[in-house]
Amino acid sequence: MTEAPAEFPPEDGTPPREPGDEWVIEILREIKEEALKHFDPRLLTALGYYIYTRHGDTLEGARELIRVLQRALFTHFRAGCGHSRIGQPRGRNPLSAIPTPRNMQ
């Protein structure tokens, strides 16, 4: 069995990133893009600055921003955002168009 090649730190001396780091960054990009559709960019900038002052430019800061934005978007949708079905009154049952067999009534 051959051994996996050793991972070397980047040339700039920073420690190597974990495989999940890219995932966190990608999720943050996606959720920020969605948040910009629903919230004032000035509010999002202020939130990002607040989290940056608490956590710096770290993955923990990115994770915290993801958590806050997820909660804000969920609450926004539940309050009745017109772009979402979450929190909207329900329509009729889509299965009601299917006739019920006579022996099951």
UniProtKB/Swiss-Prot annotation:
Identify the stretch(es) annotated as Disordered.
1-20, 83-105
Q: Keywords in alphabetical order, please.
A: Activator, AIDS, Cell cycle, Host G2/M cell cycle arrest by virus, Host nucleus, Host-virus interaction, Modulation of host cell cycle by virus, Phosphoprotein, Transcription, Transcription regulation, Viral penetration into host nucleus, Virion, Virus entry into host cell
The chain residues annotated with the modification Phosphoserine are 84
Its localization reads: Virion; Host nucleus
Q: Name one GO biological process term.
A: viral penetration into host nucleus
Which GO cellular component does the record give, naming just one? virion component
Segments traversing the membrane:
none
Query: In this record, what's one Pfam family?
Result: VPR
Q: How does it assemble?
A: Interacts with human UNG.
Task performed by this protein: Stimulates gene expression driven by the HIV-2 LTR. Prevents infected cells from undergoing mitosis and proliferating, by inducing arrest or delay in the G2 phase of the cell cycle. Cell cycle arrest creates a favorable environment for maximizing viral expression and production.
Q: What is this protein called?
A: Protein Vpr
Source organism (scientific name): Human immunodeficiency virus type 2 subtype A (isolate SBLISY)
Q: Which gene encodes it?
A: vpr
